[in-house]
Amino acid sequence: MTDTSASPPSAPSAPSAPSAAAAQAVVPAPKLTLHWGLFAAVAALLVVLAIPQPEGLTVAGQRMLAILAFAIVVWITEAVSYETSAIMITSLMAGLIGFAPTVNDPSVQYGTSKALGMALAGFSNTALALVAAALFISAAMTVTGLDRRIALVTLSAIGTSTRRILIGTIAVTIALSLVVPSATARSACVVPIMMGVIAAFGVDKKSNIAAGIMITVAQATSIWNVGIQTAAAQNLLTVGFMDKLLGERITWLQWLIAGAPWAIAMSVVLYFLVRLLLPAETDAIPGGKEAVQRELSALGPMSAPQKRLAAVSLGLLLFWATEGKLHSFDTATVTFVGLVILMMPRIGVMDWKTMQQRTPWGTLIVFGVGISLGTALLSTNAGQWLGQFVVTHSGLAAHGALLVFAILSAFLILIHLGFASATALTAALLPILIAVLQTLPGDINRVGMTMLLGFTVSFGFILPINAPQNMVCLGTETFNGRQFARIGIPVTIIGYAMMLLFAATYWRWLGWV
Protein backbone atom coordinates (compact mmCIF):
# COMPACT_ATOMS: atom_id res chain seq x y z
CA MET A 1 0.00 0.00 0.00
CA THR A 2 1.36 3.49 -0.89
CA ASP A 3 1.85 5.87 2.04
CA THR A 4 0.47 9.30 1.15
CA SER A 5 0.78 10.90 4.57
CA ALA A 6 4.02 12.73 3.68
CA SER A 7 3.36 13.44 0.00
CA PRO A 8 3.62 17.03 -1.25
CA PRO A 9 0.39 18.87 -2.00
CA SER A 10 -0.97 17.93 -5.38
CA ALA A 11 -2.93 20.03 -7.79
CA PRO A 12 -6.64 20.38 -7.09
CA SER A 13 -8.56 17.51 -8.56
CA ALA A 14 -11.30 17.98 -11.09
CA PRO A 15 -14.84 18.38 -9.76
CA SER A 16 -15.83 15.16 -11.48
CA ALA A 17 -13.39 13.15 -9.37
CA PRO A 18 -14.08 13.88 -5.70
CA SER A 19 -11.55 12.59 -3.17
CA ALA A 20 -12.21 9.52 -1.05
CA ALA A 21 -12.44 11.73 2.02
CA ALA A 22 -15.10 13.88 0.40
CA ALA A 23 -17.03 10.78 -0.65
CA GLN A 24 -16.90 9.53 2.90
CA ALA A 25 -18.06 12.88 4.26
CA VAL A 26 -21.41 12.67 2.49
CA VAL A 27 -22.36 9.51 4.42
CA PRO A 28 -24.42 10.72 7.40
CA ALA A 29 -23.34 9.42 10.78
CA PRO A 30 -25.91 7.31 12.58
CA LYS A 31 -28.00 9.34 14.99
CA LEU A 32 -27.73 7.86 18.48
CA THR A 33 -30.24 9.01 21.07
CA LEU A 34 -30.48 8.09 24.72
CA HIS A 35 -33.63 6.16 25.61
CA TRP A 36 -35.24 6.65 29.01
CA GLY A 37 -35.21 2.89 29.45
CA LEU A 38 -31.42 2.93 29.66
CA PHE A 39 -31.56 5.33 32.61
CA ALA A 40 -34.19 3.09 34.23
CA ALA A 41 -31.99 0.03 33.68
CA VAL A 42 -28.96 1.71 35.26
CA ALA A 43 -31.15 2.84 38.17
CA ALA A 44 -32.40 -0.74 38.68
CA LEU A 45 -28.80 -1.97 38.63
CA LEU A 46 -27.70 0.58 41.25
CA VAL A 47 -30.72 -0.02 43.49
CA VAL A 48 -30.08 -3.77 43.68
CA LEU A 49 -26.37 -3.14 44.31
CA ALA A 50 -27.20 -0.65 47.07
CA ILE A 51 -29.55 -2.97 48.97
CA PRO A 52 -27.92 -4.37 52.13
CA GLN A 53 -26.69 -7.87 51.34
CA PRO A 54 -29.44 -10.34 52.33
CA GLU A 55 -28.56 -13.32 54.47
CA GLY A 56 -27.51 -16.33 52.42
CA LEU A 57 -26.83 -14.31 49.24
CA THR A 58 -23.21 -14.04 48.09
CA VAL A 59 -21.68 -10.74 46.93
CA ALA A 60 -21.31 -12.16 43.41
CA GLY A 61 -24.90 -13.40 43.58
CA GLN A 62 -26.20 -9.95 44.50
CA ARG A 63 -24.26 -8.43 41.64
CA MET A 64 -25.66 -11.02 39.23
CA LEU A 65 -29.20 -10.14 40.39
CA ALA A 66 -28.37 -6.48 39.73
CA ILE A 67 -27.21 -7.39 36.21
CA LEU A 68 -30.40 -9.44 35.74
CA ALA A 69 -32.50 -6.42 36.78
CA PHE A 70 -30.57 -4.27 34.28
CA ALA A 71 -31.13 -6.84 31.52
CA ILE A 72 -34.87 -7.17 32.19
CA VAL A 73 -35.45 -3.40 32.11
CA VAL A 74 -33.38 -2.96 28.95
CA TRP A 75 -35.19 -5.83 27.21
CA ILE A 76 -38.67 -4.70 28.27
CA THR A 77 -38.13 -1.05 27.29
CA GLU A 78 -36.01 -1.90 24.22
CA ALA A 79 -33.74 0.98 25.22
CA VAL A 80 -31.00 -0.44 22.98
CA SER A 81 -30.88 -3.23 20.44
CA TYR A 82 -30.68 -6.78 21.77
CA GLU A 83 -27.19 -7.15 20.33
CA THR A 84 -26.01 -4.00 22.12
CA SER A 85 -27.63 -5.15 25.36
CA ALA A 86 -25.75 -8.45 25.08
CA ILE A 87 -22.42 -6.61 24.87
CA MET A 88 -23.43 -4.42 27.83
CA ILE A 89 -24.31 -7.49 29.92
CA THR A 90 -20.98 -9.11 29.03
CA SER A 91 -19.09 -5.99 30.14
CA LEU A 92 -21.08 -5.71 33.37
CA MET A 93 -20.42 -9.34 34.23
CA ALA A 94 -16.70 -8.96 33.56
CA GLY A 95 -16.48 -5.81 35.69
CA LEU A 96 -18.85 -6.48 38.58
CA ILE A 97 -18.19 -10.21 39.01
CA GLY A 98 -14.46 -9.79 38.35
CA PHE A 99 -14.04 -7.75 41.53
CA ALA A 100 -16.37 -9.91 43.64
CA PRO A 101 -15.17 -12.60 46.05
CA THR A 102 -15.62 -16.16 44.82
CA VAL A 103 -18.38 -18.34 46.24
CA ASN A 104 -16.06 -21.08 47.48
CA ASP A 105 -13.33 -18.83 48.91
CA PRO A 106 -14.47 -15.27 49.81
CA SER A 107 -10.85 -14.22 50.38
CA VAL A 108 -10.16 -14.60 46.65
CA GLN A 109 -11.71 -12.51 43.87
CA TYR A 110 -12.89 -13.97 40.57
CA GLY A 111 -10.74 -11.61 38.52
CA THR A 112 -11.89 -10.00 35.29
CA SER A 113 -10.41 -12.76 33.12
CA LYS A 114 -12.40 -15.51 34.83
CA ALA A 115 -15.51 -13.31 34.99
CA LEU A 116 -15.25 -12.63 31.25
CA GLY A 117 -14.95 -16.38 30.73
CA MET A 118 -18.23 -16.78 32.67
CA ALA A 119 -19.83 -14.10 30.47
CA LEU A 120 -18.75 -15.92 27.31
CA ALA A 121 -19.36 -19.49 28.53
CA GLY A 122 -22.68 -19.66 26.69
CA PHE A 123 -20.89 -19.55 23.34
CA SER A 124 -19.50 -23.04 23.96
CA ASN A 125 -22.93 -24.50 24.70
CA THR A 126 -24.27 -27.09 22.24
CA ALA A 127 -27.61 -25.25 22.17
CA LEU A 128 -25.87 -22.25 20.59
CA ALA A 129 -24.30 -24.53 17.99
CA LEU A 130 -27.73 -25.93 17.20
CA VAL A 131 -29.26 -22.46 16.83
CA ALA A 132 -26.41 -21.43 14.52
CA ALA A 133 -26.89 -24.51 12.36
CA ALA A 134 -30.66 -23.96 12.34
CA LEU A 135 -30.23 -20.37 11.15
CA PHE A 136 -27.87 -21.54 8.40
CA ILE A 137 -30.40 -24.12 7.21
CA SER A 138 -33.11 -21.43 7.24
CA ALA A 139 -30.85 -19.39 4.98
CA ALA A 140 -30.53 -22.38 2.64
CA MET A 141 -34.32 -22.66 2.46
CA THR A 142 -34.55 -19.01 1.42
CA VAL A 143 -31.66 -19.19 -1.05
CA THR A 144 -33.07 -22.20 -2.91
CA GLY A 145 -36.72 -21.10 -2.64
CA LEU A 146 -37.71 -24.49 -1.21
CA ASP A 147 -39.69 -22.86 1.59
CA ARG A 148 -41.80 -20.96 -0.95
CA ARG A 149 -42.38 -24.12 -3.01
CA ILE A 150 -43.52 -26.06 0.09
CA ALA A 151 -45.97 -23.28 0.97
CA LEU A 152 -47.45 -23.06 -2.53
CA VAL A 153 -47.74 -26.84 -2.95
CA THR A 154 -49.56 -27.07 0.39
CA LEU A 155 -51.99 -24.28 -0.54
CA SER A 156 -52.58 -25.81 -3.96
CA ALA A 157 -53.43 -29.19 -2.42
CA ILE A 158 -55.85 -27.82 0.18
CA GLY A 159 -57.78 -25.35 -1.96
CA THR A 160 -58.50 -21.64 -1.98
CA SER A 161 -61.99 -20.92 -0.70
CA THR A 162 -61.94 -18.59 2.32
CA ARG A 163 -62.46 -21.57 4.62
CA ARG A 164 -59.77 -23.65 2.94
CA ILE A 165 -57.36 -20.71 2.78
CA LEU A 166 -57.36 -20.50 6.59
CA ILE A 167 -56.82 -24.26 6.85
CA GLY A 168 -54.08 -24.00 4.21
CA THR A 169 -52.38 -21.15 6.06
CA ILE A 170 -52.21 -23.25 9.23
CA ALA A 171 -51.04 -26.29 7.24
CA VAL A 172 -48.27 -24.23 5.64
CA THR A 173 -47.00 -23.04 9.03
CA ILE A 174 -46.99 -26.64 10.31
CA ALA A 175 -45.08 -27.90 7.26
CA LEU A 176 -42.52 -25.10 7.45
CA SER A 177 -42.12 -25.52 11.23
CA LEU A 178 -40.63 -28.94 10.53
CA VAL A 179 -37.98 -27.73 8.10
CA VAL A 180 -37.43 -23.99 8.74
CA PRO A 181 -36.03 -23.59 12.27
CA SER A 182 -36.85 -19.88 12.60
CA ALA A 183 -40.28 -18.39 13.34
CA THR A 184 -39.35 -15.06 11.76
CA ALA A 185 -38.05 -16.75 8.60
CA ARG A 186 -41.23 -18.83 8.30
CA SER A 187 -43.53 -15.83 8.56
CA ALA A 188 -41.30 -13.83 6.19
CA CYS A 189 -41.70 -16.65 3.66
CA VAL A 190 -45.46 -17.10 4.03
CA VAL A 191 -46.45 -13.40 4.19
CA PRO A 192 -45.56 -12.43 0.57
CA ILE A 193 -47.24 -15.59 -0.73
CA MET A 194 -50.45 -14.85 1.16
CA MET A 195 -50.33 -11.18 0.15
CA GLY A 196 -50.09 -12.32 -3.46
CA VAL A 197 -53.11 -14.57 -2.94
CA ILE A 198 -55.05 -11.70 -1.31
CA ALA A 199 -54.19 -9.42 -4.23
CA ALA A 200 -55.22 -12.10 -6.73
CA PHE A 201 -58.55 -12.49 -4.92
CA GLY A 202 -59.18 -8.79 -5.47
CA VAL A 203 -60.25 -8.27 -1.85
CA ASP A 204 -59.54 -5.11 0.13
CA LYS A 205 -56.39 -5.16 2.28
CA LYS A 206 -58.51 -3.91 5.18
CA SER A 207 -61.10 -6.68 4.80
CA ASN A 208 -61.73 -9.37 7.40
CA ILE A 209 -60.46 -11.95 4.91
CA ALA A 210 -57.05 -10.28 4.65
CA ALA A 211 -56.87 -9.60 8.39
CA GLY A 212 -57.87 -13.17 9.22
CA ILE A 213 -55.25 -14.68 6.92
CA MET A 214 -52.39 -12.56 8.26
CA ILE A 215 -53.35 -12.95 11.92
CA THR A 216 -53.57 -16.70 11.33
CA VAL A 217 -50.02 -16.70 9.93
CA ALA A 218 -48.69 -14.97 13.07
CA GLN A 219 -50.70 -16.93 15.64
CA ALA A 220 -50.21 -20.33 14.02
CA THR A 221 -46.46 -19.70 13.89
CA SER A 222 -46.43 -19.06 17.66
CA ILE A 223 -48.64 -22.09 18.32
CA TRP A 224 -46.28 -24.41 16.45
CA ASN A 225 -43.28 -22.95 18.24
CA VAL A 226 -44.71 -25.00 21.12
CA GLY A 227 -45.21 -28.15 19.06
CA ILE A 228 -41.73 -28.58 17.55
CA GLN A 229 -38.45 -28.24 19.44
CA THR A 230 -36.44 -26.88 16.51
CA ALA A 231 -39.13 -24.39 15.46
CA ALA A 232 -37.89 -21.53 17.66
CA ALA A 233 -34.71 -20.30 19.33
CA GLN A 234 -36.32 -20.09 22.77
CA ASN A 235 -36.99 -23.84 22.67
CA LEU A 236 -33.33 -24.56 22.01
CA LEU A 237 -32.36 -22.17 24.81
CA THR A 238 -34.71 -24.06 27.13
CA VAL A 239 -33.06 -27.36 26.17
CA GLY A 240 -29.65 -25.74 26.68
CA PHE A 241 -30.60 -24.69 30.22
CA MET A 242 -31.91 -28.20 30.94
CA ASP A 243 -28.61 -29.69 29.85
CA LYS A 244 -26.48 -27.14 31.71
CA LEU A 245 -28.47 -26.75 34.93
CA LEU A 246 -30.31 -30.07 35.32
CA GLY A 247 -27.90 -32.41 33.58
CA GLU A 248 -30.64 -33.83 31.35
CA ARG A 249 -32.24 -32.88 28.07
CA ILE A 250 -35.41 -33.53 26.10
CA THR A 251 -35.02 -35.18 22.69
CA TRP A 252 -36.68 -33.81 19.57
CA LEU A 253 -39.20 -36.68 19.51
CA GLN A 254 -40.05 -36.36 23.21
CA TRP A 255 -40.78 -32.66 22.70
CA LEU A 256 -42.91 -33.43 19.62
CA ILE A 257 -44.95 -36.11 21.43
CA ALA A 258 -45.60 -33.71 24.30
CA GLY A 259 -46.15 -30.46 22.40
CA ALA A 260 -47.70 -31.41 19.05
CA PRO A 261 -51.10 -32.59 20.40
CA TRP A 262 -51.56 -29.26 22.20
CA ALA A 263 -50.52 -27.38 19.04
CA ILE A 264 -52.95 -29.40 16.91
CA ALA A 265 -55.81 -28.69 19.32
CA MET A 266 -54.95 -24.97 19.40
CA SER A 267 -54.73 -24.84 15.60
CA VAL A 268 -58.35 -26.01 15.47
CA VAL A 269 -59.28 -23.42 18.11
CA LEU A 270 -57.50 -20.69 16.14
CA TYR A 271 -59.34 -21.62 12.94
CA PHE A 272 -62.77 -21.32 14.55
CA LEU A 273 -61.88 -18.14 16.47
CA VAL A 274 -60.80 -16.39 13.27
CA ARG A 275 -63.94 -17.58 11.47
CA LEU A 276 -66.12 -16.40 14.37
CA LEU A 277 -64.47 -13.10 15.33
CA LEU A 278 -63.34 -12.00 11.84
CA PRO A 279 -66.11 -13.39 9.61
CA ALA A 280 -65.18 -13.37 5.94
CA GLU A 281 -67.15 -11.05 3.68
CA THR A 282 -67.63 -13.90 1.20
CA ASP A 283 -67.20 -17.68 1.24
CA ALA A 284 -66.19 -18.10 -2.38
CA ILE A 285 -63.20 -16.25 -3.84
CA PRO A 286 -63.04 -16.42 -7.63
CA GLY A 287 -59.59 -16.86 -9.11
CA GLY A 288 -57.95 -18.04 -5.90
CA LYS A 289 -56.91 -21.48 -7.12
CA GLU A 290 -55.67 -20.04 -10.39
CA ALA A 291 -53.56 -17.48 -8.50
CA VAL A 292 -51.81 -20.17 -6.49
CA GLN A 293 -51.30 -22.35 -9.58
CA ARG A 294 -49.89 -19.35 -11.45
CA GLU A 295 -47.38 -18.69 -8.65
CA LEU A 296 -46.45 -22.37 -8.56
CA SER A 297 -46.03 -22.58 -12.33
CA ALA A 298 -43.77 -19.52 -12.25
CA LEU A 299 -41.36 -21.46 -10.02
CA GLY A 300 -40.88 -24.08 -12.73
CA PRO A 301 -39.83 -27.67 -11.98
CA MET A 302 -38.05 -28.49 -8.75
CA SER A 303 -34.38 -27.52 -9.12
CA ALA A 304 -31.44 -29.77 -8.25
CA PRO A 305 -30.47 -27.66 -5.19
CA GLN A 306 -34.06 -27.83 -3.94
CA LYS A 307 -34.05 -31.61 -4.31
CA ARG A 308 -30.77 -31.91 -2.42
CA LEU A 309 -31.99 -29.59 0.34
CA ALA A 310 -35.26 -31.52 0.60
CA ALA A 311 -33.33 -34.79 0.92
CA VAL A 312 -31.09 -33.36 3.66
CA SER A 313 -34.10 -31.87 5.49
CA LEU A 314 -35.94 -35.20 5.45
CA GLY A 315 -32.78 -36.92 6.65
CA LEU A 316 -32.48 -34.44 9.53
CA LEU A 317 -36.12 -35.00 10.52
CA LEU A 318 -35.53 -38.76 10.51
CA PHE A 319 -32.42 -38.50 12.69
CA TRP A 320 -34.03 -35.96 15.06
CA ALA A 321 -37.06 -38.20 15.53
CA THR A 322 -35.06 -41.38 16.18
CA GLU A 323 -32.49 -39.97 18.64
CA GLY A 324 -32.11 -42.37 21.54
CA LYS A 325 -34.20 -44.99 19.71
CA LEU A 326 -32.12 -46.05 16.70
CA HIS A 327 -28.92 -44.08 17.35
CA SER A 328 -27.17 -41.94 19.97
CA PHE A 329 -26.35 -38.89 17.83
CA ASP A 330 -27.64 -35.71 19.49
CA THR A 331 -29.68 -33.11 17.60
CA ALA A 332 -26.86 -30.56 17.33
CA THR A 333 -24.35 -33.03 15.89
CA VAL A 334 -26.82 -34.34 13.32
CA THR A 335 -27.76 -30.79 12.29
CA PHE A 336 -24.12 -29.84 11.81
CA VAL A 337 -23.50 -32.88 9.61
CA GLY A 338 -26.48 -31.83 7.50
CA LEU A 339 -25.07 -28.32 7.30
CA VAL A 340 -21.70 -29.64 6.11
CA ILE A 341 -23.45 -31.51 3.28
CA LEU A 342 -25.33 -28.34 2.29
CA MET A 343 -22.04 -26.42 2.00
CA MET A 344 -19.96 -29.10 0.26
CA PRO A 345 -18.63 -28.19 -3.21
CA ARG A 346 -20.76 -29.55 -6.07
CA ILE A 347 -23.34 -31.25 -3.85
CA GLY A 348 -24.11 -28.28 -1.58
CA VAL A 349 -26.70 -25.54 -2.13
CA MET A 350 -24.84 -22.42 -0.92
CA ASP A 351 -21.38 -21.11 -0.11
CA TRP A 352 -20.10 -19.42 3.05
CA LYS A 353 -20.45 -15.89 1.65
CA THR A 354 -24.14 -16.41 0.88
CA MET A 355 -24.78 -17.93 4.28
CA GLN A 356 -22.88 -15.14 5.99
CA GLN A 357 -25.02 -12.49 4.32
CA ARG A 358 -28.32 -14.18 5.20
CA THR A 359 -27.63 -15.15 8.82
CA PRO A 360 -28.84 -12.88 11.67
CA TRP A 361 -25.60 -12.99 13.66
CA GLY A 362 -27.07 -10.77 16.37
CA THR A 363 -29.41 -13.60 17.32
CA LEU A 364 -26.42 -15.81 18.09
CA ILE A 365 -24.79 -13.09 20.22
CA VAL A 366 -27.96 -12.60 22.29
CA PHE A 367 -28.44 -16.35 22.57
CA GLY A 368 -24.89 -16.98 23.79
CA VAL A 369 -24.99 -14.19 26.36
CA GLY A 370 -28.44 -15.37 27.48
CA ILE A 371 -27.07 -18.82 28.30
CA SER A 372 -24.10 -17.21 30.09
CA LEU A 373 -26.44 -15.02 32.14
CA GLY A 374 -28.55 -17.97 33.26
CA THR A 375 -25.53 -20.14 34.05
CA ALA A 376 -23.81 -17.37 36.04
CA LEU A 377 -26.96 -16.77 38.09
CA LEU A 378 -26.67 -20.32 39.37
CA SER A 379 -22.87 -20.56 39.63
CA THR A 380 -22.90 -17.50 41.93
CA ASN A 381 -25.82 -19.00 43.92
CA ALA A 382 -28.05 -16.05 42.96
CA GLY A 383 -30.59 -18.33 41.30
CA GLN A 384 -30.72 -20.74 44.24
CA TRP A 385 -31.14 -17.87 46.71
CA LEU A 386 -33.90 -16.27 44.65
CA GLY A 387 -35.58 -19.64 44.15
CA GLN A 388 -35.55 -20.28 47.89
CA PHE A 389 -36.87 -16.76 48.51
CA VAL A 390 -39.77 -17.28 46.09
CA VAL A 391 -40.65 -20.70 47.51
CA THR A 392 -40.49 -19.48 51.12
CA HIS A 393 -42.58 -16.34 50.59
CA SER A 394 -45.08 -17.64 48.03
CA GLY A 395 -46.14 -20.87 49.68
CA LEU A 396 -45.41 -22.87 46.51
CA ALA A 397 -43.93 -25.69 48.58
CA ALA A 398 -47.36 -26.45 50.00
CA HIS A 399 -48.91 -27.01 46.56
CA GLY A 400 -48.89 -29.96 44.20
CA ALA A 401 -47.13 -30.08 40.84
CA LEU A 402 -50.23 -29.05 38.86
CA LEU A 403 -50.83 -25.89 40.90
CA VAL A 404 -47.13 -25.03 40.78
CA PHE A 405 -47.26 -25.29 36.98
CA ALA A 406 -50.47 -23.22 36.86
CA ILE A 407 -48.89 -20.41 38.91
CA LEU A 408 -45.51 -20.33 37.18
CA SER A 409 -46.96 -20.60 33.66
CA ALA A 410 -49.46 -17.80 34.37
CA PHE A 411 -46.56 -15.66 35.60
CA LEU A 412 -44.62 -16.29 32.37
CA ILE A 413 -47.63 -15.50 30.18
CA LEU A 414 -48.29 -12.21 31.99
CA ILE A 415 -44.64 -11.12 32.06
CA HIS A 416 -44.35 -11.88 28.33
CA LEU A 417 -46.61 -8.87 27.69
CA GLY A 418 -43.60 -6.71 28.52
CA PHE A 419 -41.10 -8.59 26.35
CA ALA A 420 -40.63 -8.31 22.59
CA SER A 421 -38.43 -11.42 22.50
CA ALA A 422 -39.25 -14.88 23.79
CA THR A 423 -35.52 -15.66 23.70
CA ALA A 424 -34.80 -12.72 26.03
CA LEU A 425 -37.65 -13.81 28.30
CA THR A 426 -36.23 -17.33 28.44
CA ALA A 427 -32.72 -16.09 29.16
CA ALA A 428 -33.90 -13.79 31.95
CA LEU A 429 -36.40 -15.95 33.81
CA LEU A 430 -36.09 -19.65 33.02
CA PRO A 431 -32.91 -20.18 35.09
CA ILE A 432 -34.70 -18.59 38.07
CA LEU A 433 -37.73 -20.85 37.58
CA ILE A 434 -35.44 -23.89 37.31
CA ALA A 435 -33.92 -22.83 40.64
CA VAL A 436 -37.44 -22.55 42.09
CA LEU A 437 -38.23 -26.09 40.88
CA GLN A 438 -34.99 -27.40 42.38
CA THR A 439 -35.91 -25.86 45.73
CA LEU A 440 -39.39 -27.38 45.85
CA PRO A 441 -39.78 -30.56 47.89
CA GLY A 442 -41.40 -33.72 46.57
CA ASP A 443 -41.02 -35.78 43.44
CA ILE A 444 -41.73 -33.10 40.82
CA ASN A 445 -40.27 -33.99 37.42
CA ARG A 446 -38.07 -30.91 37.09
CA VAL A 447 -36.98 -31.65 33.52
CA GLY A 448 -40.57 -32.20 32.41
CA MET A 449 -41.81 -29.11 34.24
CA THR A 450 -39.04 -27.03 32.64
CA MET A 451 -40.15 -28.20 29.19
CA LEU A 452 -43.78 -27.31 29.95
CA LEU A 453 -42.78 -23.87 31.21
CA GLY A 454 -40.75 -23.54 28.01
CA PHE A 455 -44.01 -24.13 26.13
CA THR A 456 -45.65 -21.12 27.80
CA VAL A 457 -42.74 -18.86 26.82
CA SER A 458 -44.14 -18.94 23.26
CA PHE A 459 -47.42 -17.32 24.37
CA GLY A 460 -46.91 -14.10 22.39
CA PHE A 461 -50.50 -13.99 21.18
CA ILE A 462 -51.96 -10.74 22.56
CA LEU A 463 -49.79 -7.84 21.34
CA PRO A 464 -48.06 -7.56 17.95
CA ILE A 465 -44.87 -6.45 19.73
CA ASN A 466 -44.69 -9.75 21.67
CA ALA A 467 -43.07 -11.72 18.82
CA PRO A 468 -41.08 -10.88 15.65
CA GLN A 469 -43.46 -12.92 13.46
CA ASN A 470 -46.34 -10.76 14.70
CA MET A 471 -44.49 -7.63 13.58
CA VAL A 472 -43.72 -9.14 10.16
CA CYS A 473 -47.45 -9.72 9.64
CA LEU A 474 -48.40 -6.32 11.10
CA GLY A 475 -46.18 -4.71 8.47
CA THR A 476 -48.65 -5.80 5.76
CA GLU A 477 -51.16 -3.24 7.15
CA THR A 478 -53.98 -5.76 6.81
CA PHE A 479 -54.94 -5.54 10.50
CA ASN A 480 -54.43 -3.35 13.55
CA GLY A 481 -53.49 -4.06 17.15
CA ARG A 482 -57.11 -4.16 18.27
CA GLN A 483 -58.01 -6.86 15.74
CA PHE A 484 -54.90 -8.82 16.70
CA ALA A 485 -55.85 -8.71 20.39
CA ARG A 486 -59.44 -9.69 19.55
CA ILE A 487 -58.07 -13.04 18.39
CA GLY A 488 -55.05 -13.15 20.69
CA ILE A 489 -56.83 -12.74 24.04
CA PRO A 490 -59.16 -15.74 23.61
CA VAL A 491 -56.27 -17.76 22.11
CA THR A 492 -54.25 -17.00 25.25
CA ILE A 493 -57.08 -17.84 27.66
CA ILE A 494 -58.06 -21.05 25.88
CA GLY A 495 -54.41 -21.98 25.32
CA TYR A 496 -53.65 -21.57 29.04
CA ALA A 497 -56.73 -23.62 29.98
CA MET A 498 -55.62 -26.31 27.51
CA MET A 499 -52.15 -26.27 29.09
CA LEU A 500 -53.70 -27.00 32.50
CA LEU A 501 -55.94 -29.71 31.03
CA PHE A 502 -52.98 -31.38 29.31
CA ALA A 503 -50.89 -31.08 32.49
CA ALA A 504 -53.63 -32.80 34.49
CA THR A 505 -54.10 -35.59 31.96
CA TYR A 506 -51.90 -36.23 28.92
CA TRP A 507 -48.61 -34.80 30.19
CA ARG A 508 -49.13 -36.50 33.55
CA TRP A 509 -49.66 -39.82 31.74
CA LEU A 510 -46.38 -39.22 29.91
CA GLY A 511 -44.68 -38.63 33.26
CA TRP A 512 -43.72 -34.99 32.70
CA VAL A 513 -45.78 -33.61 35.62
UniProtKB/Swiss-Prot annotation:
Sequence repeats lie at residues 9-11, 12-14, 15-17, 18-20. The keyword Membrane applies. GO terms for molecular function: organic anion transmembrane transporter activity. Residues 9-20 are annotated as: 4 X 3 AA tandem repeats of P-S-A. It is a multi-pass membrane protein. GO terms for cellular component: plasma membrane. It is found in: Cell membrane. The chain crosses the membrane at residues 32-52, 56-76, 79-99, 126-146, 165-185, 208-228, 254-274, 309-329, 332-352, 360-380, 400-420, 422-442, 447-467, 487-507. Keywords: Cell membrane, Membrane, Repeat, Transmembrane, Transmembrane helix. It comes from the Bacteria. Disulfide bonds: none annotated. PANTHER family: SOLUTE CARRIER FAMILY 13 MEMBER, SOLUTE CARRIER FAMILY 13 MEMBER 2. Belongs to the SLC13A/DASS transporter (TC 2.A.47) family. DIT1 subfamily. This is Membrane protein. It comes from Cupriavidus necator (strain ATCC 17699 / DSM 428 / KCTC 22496 / NCIMB 10442 / H16 / Stanier 337) (Ralstonia eutropha). The lineage of its organism: Bacteria, Pseudomonadati, Pseudomonadota, Betaproteobacteria, Burkholderiales.
